Structures are given as C-alpha cells and as structure tokens.
Amino acid sequence: MGAVPLKNNKPVEAGVRTVTVLGATGSIGDSTMDLLRGAPGRYRVEALTANSNVEALVKLAREFAARFVAVADPARFGELKDALAGSGIECGVGESAIIEAASRPADWLMAAVSGAAGLKPALAAVDRGTTIALANKECLVCAGDFFMQRAAKAGACILPADSEHNALFQALSSGNRDELTRVIITASGGPFRTWAAADIEKATLAQALKHPNWSMGRKITIDSASMMNKGLEVIEAACLFTLTPDEIDVLVHPQSIVHGMVEFSDRSVVAQLGTPDMRTPIAHCLGWPERIVGPAAKLDLASIGQLTFEAPDFTRFPALRLAYDALRTGNGATTVYNAANEIAVAAFIGEKIRFGAIARLVEATMNGWVRAGNLAPLASADDAIAIDHNARNMAASLLPQIAAKAT
C-alpha cells in the first residue's frame, strides 16, 4: 500500500499536535478549521495559506494564532502585511511562500490547495515525512506514481481526505492487501442521473450546479454532474491503493450514504457509511490513528428508509469511461485528462461550449496527445506540470472546433 497505512498501527502522539492547512479558506479548508475550532487545546496551528482571500485568511490567522501565513496572489500581499502588522505573525507571498508553509515543522498537514499549484507544496511536505491529509486531486491524477513513491521513500504518511477514498481507507483496515479483490466507489449520479442524453447535452450552468446531496465548490459540482469527478476518483484510488483499473468499480448510489466498499477474497464486503458531510472524512484524518468527536449529523437509517444502487451509464456519462481509458494508457494520460477537463469546464462556465461538449473536448485532447507521440513516464513534478501546461494549450486550441460541432 506504500505511503497509505493499511493498519492503524501508528503510535498515538502525546501532547498538542501542530498542524498546517494549505488552502485554509476554501471549502475543504473551512471544514478543517471548523474541526480545529471544535477541539481547543488539542492542536496548534503552525501555518495557513490561501490563494487570494486575504480577509478570511487574516481572521483565521488571528483566531488560531498561526505562526506563518501565505497568500498566493502577489496583488494581495500588501493587504495581508498591513492587516497583520504588529501581530508577530510572519507573512509570505507566492508559490515559494506556499512551499515554505508546507515545509515548516508540523505533525499533520491538510493539502487542500486546488489545481496543479498544489503539487509542489504537497511534495515539500512529503519530503519532511509529514502526515498529510490529501485533498488535492492533482497530486495523484497528474503525478500519482511519482508522488506516492516519493512519499514512501520519505516516510510520509498519506491519509485520503476525500470521502470516497477515506471510506476505502477505513474499510481496507478489515483485511490485508493480498486479500482484496476489488473496491467499489459510490457516486450520487449528480443532478442528471435520470436525464436523457439529449437533455444532458444542452444542460445549463444553473442546472449543473444543483447537486442533490453535497454542498461543494462550483468546479467540483460541475464535475459531479458530468461524472468527471468520479473518473478522477477512480484514478486517485488506483494511485493511493496500488489498484488496477479492473479492481475498481463505480456504483451509482443516489442517497450518498455508502461512500465506499471493499470486497475481499472470501467475498465479504466491508462498507463505510455516513451522512454526506466532508467534515467526517477530514475528522478521521485529523484524529488518526485515534478518532475525534465529529460535528456531522448522526446517521439515521430508519428515517432514510432505503438505500438504492445502480450501474453507471458510460454512454450518457462518457467522462467516466475516459478515466478508465486514461488509467490504462498511463504515461501522463491522466494528467491530460484532468488538464483538458479544467479547460472544458471553464469554457462551459463561460458559455463557450455546451455541457455535452465537456467530455468531447477531453476525449479529443487525449486522442490528440496520443497521436502526437507525447506519452512518457513522469520523473519529476516539473514533468507533470509541463504536461499539464501543454495539455491545457492543446485543449484550448481544440476548443473552437469542438464548440462549432453540432450534435
């Protein structure tokens, strides 16, 4: 299992634990800070970072007496310095400062910087051998094998903070890796689960943002509507738990109560359940190897009444099929998959393409990448970032013809 601990055999740390939160003002960061707020005296905040939300960062820095804060956007640095003048809190700006925050001594770090920008800071924490709650998808989708190998070499402990992967992480502790036969990741099906393909094709932005169960950011909500997010999770699961594509199944589960299941060789299936609240998997990571008191609502199965499941439709939701294709292709294909999707979603939000064109742009970019002979194994973070950059450019160049095509 590499850097992901299969068994909870890490000694319990005595005393106050130091924590760093990268991406403290985003949705994952907000949930993390809420959990820290609910455990006064148990944790001390070392560093906090944000992309550009200086107002929220300053409030958190003062509330938690952080020792170091950093903002990625250079245009906001003056505001940050002025707001914290005389506080004794160190301030930094730009990528180097985010990396510095990740490099500072901490017992536990939340890696929640979104996008490819989160890769180098996460690697900096890995190199310190830190226990990392990983919420950044790009670390695994763009540089999975390289990232996990480096983590194992450095002795870093990677804890999956995403709800589905955290569910698998918990269920896997019921057996040994060589006893595993498959894992099952659940998907709500999103707002278009029952829609016809023709209706999905022309879905509006407002419709795509109406997720039935989860409260999330704009980008991930659109990814959930296309099931691109589930495709990314398939890729992440393969990297985290050293799985082949054939060992990973996706099951549509509209209630979002069962988050993941693991099947073992004796055909026992162990599942993790909980209300759809991101604070639950984050609390599991924050307390690990113990468990802390979480603020999520208690699960009441009697009031829910029914849990239903159905097979995913790879025809109506081609983004999921493309994830398996990218995983089997390897050699940077998953990086291309993610990068092209970023361009496609931005184009959809900007009303440049229809919803149905998101997956078509991703597929066209992947096919173009393979035809150009660009496939090559990743040897460094810079390799992953370069592929991400070049794939974005290719997707952007293909965008006009994809937008022009009638369906």
Swiss-Prot record:
Cofactor(s) annotated in UniProt: Mg(2+); Mn(2+)
Pathways involved: Isoprenoid biosynthesis; isopentenyl diphosphate biosynthesis via DXP pathway; isopentenyl diphosphate from 1-deoxy-D-xylulose 5-phosphate: step 1/6
InterPro entries: DXP_reductoisomerase, DXP_reductoisomerase_C, DXP_reductoisomerase_N, DXPR_C, DXPR_C_sf, NAD(P)-bd_dom_sf
Source taxon at top rank: Bacteria
Alphabetical UniProt keywords: Isoprene biosynthesis, Manganese, Metal-binding, NADP, Oxidoreductase
Binding site residues for NADPH: T25, G26, S27, I28, N53, N136, E138, G217
Reactions it catalyzes: 2-C-methyl-D-erythritol 4-phosphate + NADP(+) = 1-deoxy-D-xylulose 5-phosphate + NADPH + H(+)
GO terms, biological process: isopentenyl diphosphate biosynthetic process, methylerythritol 4-phosphate pathway involved in terpenoid biosynthetic process
Pfam families reported for this sequence: DXP_redisom_C, DXP_reductoisom, DXPR_C
Role summary: Catalyzes the NADPH-dependent rearrangement and reduction of 1-deoxy-D-xylulose-5-phosphate (DXP) to 2-C-methyl-D-erythritol 4-phosphate (MEP).
Membership in a protein family: Belongs to the DXR family.
Protein name (record): 1-deoxy-D-xylulose 5-phosphate reductoisomerase
Gene source species: Nitrobacter hamburgensis (strain DSM 10229 / NCIMB 13809 / X14)
